[in-house]
Amino acid sequence: KVLEHIVDTVLQFEGDRHNMYRILRSIKNRFGSTAELGIYEMRGDGLRPVDNPSELLLTQGGGQLSGIAIAAAIEGIRPFLIETQALVSTAAYGTPQRSATGFDLRRLNMLLAVLEKRVGFKLAQKDVFLNIAGGLRVTDPAIDLSVIAAVLSSNVDTAIEHNICMAGEVGLSGEIRPVARIGQRISEAAKLGFSSILIPEGNLKGLETPKASIEIIPVNRVEAALRCLF
């Protein structure tokens, strides 16, 4: 900590040794914003920058699978689409397990409580495992909606259409709250060929019509979002 006060910039290198991707975050920057993020790929000749991380972080082909939802996220200053994976199964060993990789476990528990209380899905006796594909650690609250969608997709064993993505923060009463920089998220989804994106209804005000052809589906409650997906 003493050294951090002396230097102008502190960078943090993230990523486990079993994953090919590494993330470079700015923790301290005396001369600019700390909202910076770089994604690199480990190759045989060393680290190389990833110009379009969205294409690498999404499953290519292989058919539609349950328990997968695509989130339009923003980390640092760049938007990209990430794959949220969930597995829900009946607890076989007493106390149900809750596990999250790349996502805050306390927030996952909060979202599961919202599903129980506000939507009526009984998950108290289910094991729930959540994973953010690519080894990323995401803090953007806009992926709340995709987490809920992935969990319910796995619970009912029904796949979500592969050309739909979503962005929205989920509140304790089950409302879908507006998120920042929604225009960038929509543009990124359109660029990658998605036909529809679910966004908070509160983000419609002042939203410019995207140049690319993509259907914008506004939702204000978790229940409304689920009706659009299943």
Features from the language model and the residues they span:
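Peripheral, non-AAA+ core regions of ATP-driven protein-machinery
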Residues: 1-230
